[in-house]
């Protein structure tokens, strides 16, 4: 992620104070700080370019999907043919069978 690569914030740059030596700022300290700034800007630029490429790719894919959707021929939706509805479930059938057995064989089955 980009925040992992960036070491400085705008506030860090604004508030950075360099120690002054006998003849002004310590050149090594300024150079190190500027090197960090350069690395941050390079990281920003690289991330920005990657995001631009990703954005362009996603826009192309979106346009392709839109085109594919508009080119699909519109077919009428067929409603399924109504199947005969049987209200007899397995439990109903078992109850009826049990009642028939009782009627035919009487209580002999259950002794």
UniProtKB/Swiss-Prot annotation:
Belongs to the GpsB family. Pfam families: DivIVA (PF05103). Its main location: cytoplasm. Disulfide bonds: none annotated. Keywords: Cell cycle, Cell division, Cell shape, Coiled coil, Cytoplasm. GO terms for cellular component: cytoplasm. Divisome component that associates with the complex late in its assembly, after the Z-ring is formed, and is dependent on DivIC and PBP2B for its recruitment to the divisome. Together with EzrA, is a key component of the system that regulates PBP1 localization during cell cycle progression. Its main role could be the removal of PBP1 from the cell pole after pole maturation is completed. Also contributes to the recruitment of PBP1 to the division complex. Not essential for septum formation. The keyword Cell division applies. Forms polymers through the coiled coil domains. Interacts with PBP1, MreC and EzrA. InterPro entries: Cell_cycle_GpsB, DivIVA_domain, DivIVA_fam. It is found in: Cytoplasm. One of its GO terms (biological process) is cell division. It comes from Bacillus cereus (strain ATCC 14579 / DSM 31 / CCUG 7414 / JCM 2152 / NBRC 15305 / NCIMB 9373 / NCTC 2599 / NRRL B-3711). Gene3D superfamilies: 6.10.250.660. This is Cell cycle protein GpsB. The keyword Phosphoprotein does not apply. Residues 38-72 form a coiled coil.
